[in-house]
Amino acid sequence: MKDIRKTQELVGSVYLEPIKFTLVSREEGPGWTVEKTKLIEMWYRRFLTLVKIYPNQTIVPTKDIDTFWHYHILDTRKYMDDCDKVFGSYFHHFPYFGSRGEEDKANFDKTF
């Protein structure tokens, strides 16, 4: 339980305000509401926490979590620094979850 809390604190310390600002923007992002952005930020942080705690498991993000992740990745320096802080190395994005057959779709469905 202690490791989960430490990981939650670590992931919680990642500064995501610039990403949230872009997600709310209708010009630079999808124009999400502030409420939706806060909710998806919470789920994104939970996703990162699960990936950190279970590195050998396939953890598949929802579409909204994946969108948040994409906007995080676009700030390449920040994303690399955040990955180093949380994972100790770069956390690669794999965009094909759920689209490579039944087993892949089952992994997607199992995660969320």
Regions found by a protein language model. Give the residues of each.
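Intrinsically disordered, low-complexity, repeat-rich regions
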Residues: 1-112
